[in-house]
Amino acid sequence: MQESKLKVIAGALLHDIGKPAYRGDKSKNHSISGYEFLNDTVGIKDTEILEQVKYHHKNMIQNSSIADNSLAYITYIADNIASGADRRKVDENQGFDMDMQLESVFNILNGNNQHYKYKPQTMENGINYPIENEISFSKEIYKKICDDIADCLKGIDENNSEYINSLLEVMEADCSFVPSSTSKNEIADISLYDHCKITAAVGSCIIDYLEQEGITNYKDELYNNSKQFYSKKAFLMYSFDISGIQDFIYTISAKGSLKLLRSRSFYLEMLCEHLI
């Protein structure tokens, strides 16, 4: 994988890392909080990654002096696309609630009107079943999440191609139960991990498109003319059918059946993890 694409994926995965830091210390916006967290606490000095974290919102970009080919423009529009896909608005309430929990995606499925929420925790605490009780996402919990992320990222070399896999593991472990948005005007059932992963996926597609088309001025293409970009055929969606997979899993001999069942189930899980 090309170095520029690796940096887009890394920057996109980390672009909202300032949200846990900001919610734990509300003195700055989350873009600045994320930049300072990675630069000062974690020790990441790669400018191309840091720019994506600091300048992924319009109000930050328009007052910046970043280059026309900065990868920040890719993460900026990838974030907008991912946000458009995962934000479903409700009609009531305004403002933000920094203590908001992540809601279950099943709350509104099939016309449901439920209020199950996940306990604020990391994946190291085991299976987190949604509950109806209110447990606020305290400043202390956000601090623990930031400390865990910092400890893990400090031991990772961002110049190594394995960095992305390690980064995905860290984000999944610590941000799977952190809401991406704490706006009272949105349904908070998308985790920060899922949002960042979608942003990284979209960003990796965009850089492939730009390189294929020979486009080097990312500012003009993705920022100044962002509305026109949305109508371009920059993405290719594909699907695959694994119906009948049950036969593969369950058609096994009696001898060692439990071991075979577990291994085939694990194989399927890894296949989905790799493809999705």
Language-model segments: what does each one mean?
Residues 12-15, 79, 199, 241, ...:
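Conserved structural-core and active-site-/substrate-pathway-adjacent residues in large, well-folded domains
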Residues 1-130, 178-182, 230, 250-254:
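Divalent metal-dependent catalytic cores for phosphoryl transfer on phosphate-bearing substrates
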Residues 255-276:
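Surface-exposed, low-hydrophobicity interaction/linker segments
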Residues 27-35, 196, 265-269:
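Amphipathic alpha-helical segments in well-structured domains
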Residues 194-213:
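Extended, Lys/Arg-enriched charged tracts that mediate electrostatic binding to polyanionic substrates
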Residues 237-247:
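Catalytic-site or vestigial catalytic-site microsegments of nucleotide-handling domains
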Residues 232-235:
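A short, charged/proline- and glycine-enriched loop
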Residues 122-188:
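Extended, charge-enriched "interface" segments that sit outside catalytic cores
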